């Protein structure tokens, strides 16, 4: 019996070959009707025999394109219209809301990579080859629906051959919006740098050369043509870039979401030059390898890591260095892991294949500023760093850094992917957030402004949380401007104007100041404590509504009492929290100065615990010199000396005390090197649990029941130092003490309140030793452990947690 269905498919269904997929399976199942790409999703009218329609719908669910994500299939029986065939219709531009999910950018697929290196293919060595299964998506889109005219490809009318492919439902490039070739598409732009010239004047020079070339079609004698408009010119640009790289130079290379700075990953001098020019310090650099086999020579790649590093997202994956492999000084010194990735754009494939070895690929930006996306601006900003630029004339609409992930042992769950930085390949795919009451408007929008460091923002619409790509640290005007730019882009693209706002408690954060201004203009505001947001994020990702014990260990977060928190054990639900336990407060002499100089933190701990007279403490006092007296005065007088309960600062103090890292050059370095120094050991120092006798505080938000006292840890550490215990053992004992403190405080909370679920969050859980150890120990003690899934444990998840709390409080008020 024949029947007809109207079918709506919601999810990542645009720009991923979904309509040709529907077209092909409809023909296979003898279905007539049509498929339409609309702003709300993909609409299908299907007519056929009942069994054929059932099989058709089943295949939509089971065999959707790999780059797609089907979140929901809605079906409604409708009258037969007796269509005689199945067709693909054009987009419905009259749809009211932009609810379709936009695909992230996708790595070059195997088929396109094969064509890229096939001399018989018309796109041989074309640096922008793509199809419906790969290529740019979110970084080129201006508005929905995802059609070429609404992307940065609108400036490139297709040639006859590309247009034929684009219109053929049987072709892999059917409605591939970025489809192009040498004849009609974007091309490379080659610019060399005169380091003796002013950046702006040098830009005028290269633009004059480009103008001259455009007029007469020839470059200066002995010079590379500035535009790679054909195979010969494009290959010449690749060859020129490779020559500079082999000579130890630095190339700025335009990618999907911005520029990279590239140099030879095996050249110590090149790495030193890059670090000096970029003021990079000792922060580890990521390397891009030409092939998986080449990567395996240097790093251990398990099955889970291989799936990540070869998948469509192509993130940077943190991999264990292979014992005996040679790594150039300056790449990732002192660490057991290397951030590695494979090429994910055609240009990168060409560059890496021609170079024949790994290249450093680090973000093309100045220190603490956003990645550069515009060719002219990048030339000026990166002028003193790069020796040449490989840009292009395809505009980037939204800047994106590379994502960073790792694989950890997650106890009974086995191996799990831990997000470190969520950006290209993952955003803007929404993270589910099931906390909206049914009576609330499913399309109401909450905007969560996020934290100061590792900022993301979040647009919560219904149960879809659009967490932005990694923005960075909102401590300067350029990054704040990038935050505003990305916020406006998301709101316009998804037609989502916030009806309420969530932000951090800290009054001086730029994002919080923006939220306060919006509140003054009438928008409801929900302020969320930093560590509550951390735990709420884990709860929401795991769809937990019942109370949990939340362990939020990190470097800093504004506390309800005005102190700097960071070693918190909380009793949490979605709407509120009680502070159950925390590390005893330590002074931060000089505030930010103590964060940047762990020796100050070590001195403060020894001062607080009356251990400065211990013989092993002398080295800290000597290393600080006159600053020791300054620290003394600040601590004694309470001047410029905030108090902190931060677990991260404790690890910094231990690192400095052991001489592992006294002067870090990047955030987290002291703790990272402490972890790298630790060898597996069952020995542990002690962190004592004592009853909090403080009476000044009066609310559950700032008064804990239990204090975690690190005095025994530091006393035993000094004794071990005096006894010449190996640093590797002392580092392990400090880590094990942290793990034991987590378990013991959770056991005490469980005994008092009966809560058996523990949520772990905060930057300290970027530490593999502590994370894997805590999971194993907690599960061994009978707890269920919840971790972040799609979002990182660090501050990259804060905006999502803020949105979860704001939504839960709104539901509570409405009920």
Place the predicted regions along the sequence by residue:
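Intrinsically disordered, low-complexity, mixed-charge
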Residues: 1-182, 186-189
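Internal gly/pro-rich beta-alpha loop/helix module
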Residues: 63, 69, 150, 165, ...
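A phosphate-binding glycine/aspartate-rich beta-alpha loop in the early core of alpha/beta enzymes
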Residues: 77, 258-321
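A contiguous, well-structured pocket-lining segment that forms one wall/lid of small-molecule binding clefts
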Residues: 185-187, 451-481, 485-489, 604-756, ...
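Short glycine-rich phosphate-binding loop at a beta-alpha junction
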Residues: 252, 495-507, 753-764
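Conserved phosphate-binding catalytic cores of ATP/NTP-utilizing and phosphoryl-transfer enzymes
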Residues: 296-301, 350, 371-378, 402-403, ...
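Conserved phosphate-binding/catalytic loops in two-lobed NTP-binding clefts
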Residues: 504, 522-534, 756-761, 768, ...
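Glycine-rich phosphate-binding/hydrolytic loop that grips phosphoryl groups
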Residues: 531-553, 557-559, 598-607, 735-736, ...
């Amino acid at each position: 019996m024949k029947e007809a269905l109207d079918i709506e498919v919601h999810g990542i269904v645009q720009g991923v070959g979904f309509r040709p997929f529907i077209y092909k399976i409809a023909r296979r199942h003898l279905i007539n009707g049509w498929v339409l790409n609309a702003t709300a999703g993909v609409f299908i009218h299907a007519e056929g025999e009942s069994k054929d329609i059932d099989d058709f719908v089943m295949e939509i669910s089971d065999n959707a394109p790999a780059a797609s994500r089907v979140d929901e299939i809605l079906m409604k029986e409708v009258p037969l219209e007796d269509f005689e065939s199945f067709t693909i219709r054009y987009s419905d531009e009259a749809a009211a809301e932009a609810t379709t999910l936009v695909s992230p950018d996708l790595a070059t697929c195997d088929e396109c990579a094969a064509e890229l290196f096939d001399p018989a293919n018309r796109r041989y060595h074309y640096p922008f080859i793509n199809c419906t299964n790969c290529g740019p998506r979110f970084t080129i889109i201006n508005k929905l629906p995802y059609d070429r005219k609404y992307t940065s490809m609108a400036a490139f009318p297709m040639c006859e051959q590309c247009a034929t492919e684009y219109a053929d439902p049987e072709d892999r490039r059917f409605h591939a919006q970025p489809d192009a070739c040498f004849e009609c598409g974007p091309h490379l732009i080659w610019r060399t740098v005169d380091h003796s010239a002013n950046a702006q004047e040098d830009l005028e020079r290269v633009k004059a050369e480009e103008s001259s070339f455009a007029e007469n079609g020839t470059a200066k004698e002995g010079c590379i043509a500035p535009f790679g408009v054909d195979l010969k010119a494009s290959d010449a640009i690749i060859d020129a870039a490779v020559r500079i790289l082999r000579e130890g130079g630095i190339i700025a290379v335009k990618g999907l979401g911005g520029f990279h700075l590239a140099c030879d990953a095996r050249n110590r001098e090149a790495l030193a030059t890059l670090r000096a020019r970029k003021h990079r310090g000792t922060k580890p650099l990521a390397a891009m390898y030409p092939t998986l086999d080449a990567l395996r020579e240097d790093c251990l790649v398990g099955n889970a890591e291989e799936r990540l590093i070869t998948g469509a997202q192509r993130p940077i994956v943190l991999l264990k260095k292979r014992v005996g492999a040679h790594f150039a000084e300056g790449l990732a010194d002192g660490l057991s892991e290397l951030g590695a990735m494979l090429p994910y754009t055609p240009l990168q494939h060409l560059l890496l294949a021609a170079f024949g070895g790994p290249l450093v690929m680090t973000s093309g930006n100045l220190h603490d500023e956003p990645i550069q996306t515009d060719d002219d601006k990048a030339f000026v900003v990166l002028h003193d760093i790069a020796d040449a630029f490989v840009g292009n004339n395809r505009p980037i609409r939204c800047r994106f850094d590379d994502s960073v992930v790792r694989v950890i042992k997650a106890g009974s769950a086995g191996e799990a992917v831990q997000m470190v930085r969520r950006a290209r390949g993952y955003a803007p795919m929404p993270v589910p957030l099931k906390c909206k009451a049914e009576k609330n408007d499913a399309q109401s929008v909450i905007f969560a402004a996020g934290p100061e460091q590792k900022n993301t923002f979040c647009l919560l619409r219904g149960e879809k949380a659009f967490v932005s790509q990694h923005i960075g640290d909102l401590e300067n005007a350029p990054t704040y401007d990038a935050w505003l730019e990305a916020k406006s882009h998301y709101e316009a693209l998804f037609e989502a104007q916030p009806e309420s706002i969530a932000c951090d408690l800290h009054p001086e954060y730029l994002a919080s100041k923006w939220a306060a201004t919006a509140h003054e203009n009438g928008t409801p505001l929900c302020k969320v404590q930093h560590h509550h947001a951390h735990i709420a994020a884990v709860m929401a990702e795991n769809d937990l509504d019942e109370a949990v014990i939340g362990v939020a260990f990190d470097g800093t977060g504004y506390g309800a009492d005005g102190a700097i928190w960071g070693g918190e054990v909380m009793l949490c639900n979605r709407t509120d929290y009680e502070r159950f336990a925390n590390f005893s407060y330590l002074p931060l002499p000089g505030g930010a100065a103590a964060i940047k100089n762990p020796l100050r933190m070590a001195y403060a701990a020894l001062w607080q615990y009356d251990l400065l007279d211990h013989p092993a403490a002398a080295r800290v006092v000597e290393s600080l010199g006159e600053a020791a007296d300054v620290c003394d005065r600040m601590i004694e007088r309470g001047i410029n000396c905030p108090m902190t309960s931060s677990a991260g600062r404790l690890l910094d103090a231990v690192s400095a005390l052991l001489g592992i890292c006294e002067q870090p050059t990047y955030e987290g370095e002291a703790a990272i090197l402490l972890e790298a120094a630790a060898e597996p050991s069952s020995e542990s120092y002690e962190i004592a649990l004592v009853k909090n006798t403080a009476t000044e505080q009066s609310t559950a938000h700032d008064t804990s029941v239990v204090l975690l006292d690190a005095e025994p840890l530091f006393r035993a550490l000094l004794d071990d130092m005096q006894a010449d215990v190996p640093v590797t053992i002392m580092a392990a004992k400090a880590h094990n003490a942290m793990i034991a403190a987590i378990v013991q405080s959770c056991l005490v909370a469980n005994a008092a309140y009966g809560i058996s679920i523990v949520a772990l969050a905060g930057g300290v859980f970027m530490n593999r030793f502590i994370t894997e150890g805590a999971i194993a120990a907690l599960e061994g003690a009978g707890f269920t452990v919840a971790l972040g899934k799609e979002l990182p444990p660090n501050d990259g998840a804060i905006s999502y947690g803020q949105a979860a709390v704001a939504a839960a409080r709104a539901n509570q008020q409405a009920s």
